[in-house]
Amino acid sequence: MRNFTPAWFKKGFFNESLFCDDFLSSHQLLYSNGAFFTPDGRMVDPMPLRCEIFEMMREYVGANLAKKVTNVVDVLKLAAQVEDFPPVTDRIALANGTLYLDGTFQEGKPEIVRNRLPVKYDPKAVQPTHWLRFLSDLLYPEDVPTVQEFIGYCLIPSNKGQRMMVIKGSGGEGKSQIGVVLSRLFGCNMKDGSIGKISENRFARADLEHTLLCVDDDMRMEALRQTNYVKSIVTAQGQMDLERKGKQSYQGWMYARLLAFSNGDLQALYDRSDGFYRRQLILTTKDKPLSRVDDPDIAEKMAAEVEGILLWAFEGLQRLVKNGFQFTESDRAKRNRELVKRDNNNVFDFLESEGYIRLKADACTSSKELYEVYRMWCEENSLNAIKARGFSDALIANQRRYNLESTNNIVNSSGRRVRGFVGIEALVQPDLTPNSWRA
């Protein structure tokens, strides 16, 4: 026989609102942006919550218990709702406490957090020798600090760095093993994903909400048809418009960083802007030695060093913050980005070619004439020409680099004023007669 009847169950009547008040008085829980949050971070699986509610109710509520549990969870969303729960970027919530960016550590879980990593902070953790040796074998020495800073950057919910990372190789180097180790470091705060899907699917961004890191361990080689979704994730510094299938769009916090492993470059089919490439940290792996024998257990060995890897990544984060979120970038990494940019936009090579055009301060050429010279250059070099509008846009975007000036005051051969550029001279004379005028 029961000696105590809770306030939420009187005279055979179950009061859902009072139950939620009672539940929240003994549980640290809030609801925001479509998710429950606790001192352990975002509640990824609501089943443990449902089970606890079930155990509290089962002695008092008999019929339709499962349905009533669902109703309680829905009411709990209202009772625990907060208007906003912004990310906190000066600390890292860990399995045994909170590590602040200044290096101080507070034990315990006193507050509700957005993300908590499943790794303990141990200032005396041994150096991750397997991990460091793996990176030394995989990457050039000057690129290791960049990886250290990027992984550290992913520890906090911030996009101040404004960069994504692409690690490129020929295949077989073992670069995707990094993703296995990071899944141990970040736990449910990391997702496997696809850069291609993010670029194509307007619902894909919402899947990355509340996530610190998205890893594409085998990036597709096709050029992206559109880049605005990817760029918006890399640069988001606040709430953005997110959309889930069949639901109204809403404002949500987005701080997922993008890391891709690939055998090729991340290219855009139409976007040739400097911004698309400037947002990429592009690292190339060393060639795999023919004599190297791969260790099938290397991922497990490195994952076992996760506490030491945390200290290593935190050192990179502190360096990044000290440098104003400017990543350490080797000359090789900068050159990689320039090569990828040029590979997707041959206008740069055209402007630096000989025999077709000349950069000359007092010269001027119409946009149409320049484009025809460019098409001739492409044809004679077995290259595909971009469209006329894209060609003009590329010249305008880089006019300072080549000391050009866009103007609409060029006089063409017919005496009409047209658009063109000052500071460039055509050395060849393509046939500008329209096909319809020719005999």
Question: Predicted regions span which residues?
Answer:
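Positively charged interface segments
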Residues: A66, T70, V88, F186-C188, ...
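Alpha-helical scaffold elements adjacent to nucleotide-binding pockets in ATP/GTP-utilizing enzyme cores
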Residues: E52, M56, I178-V181, T211, ...
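Conserved nucleotide-sensing/catalytic segment adjacent to the nucleotide-binding pocket
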Residues: A204-Y250
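Replication-associated primase and helicase/ATPase modules
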Residues: M1-H27, F37, R42-D45, K120-D137, ...
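Extended, Lys/Arg-enriched charged tracts that mediate electrostatic binding to polyanionic substrates
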Residues: W8-K11, L65-L99
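Phosphate-handling catalytic cores of nucleic-acid transaction enzymes
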Residues: A303-N345
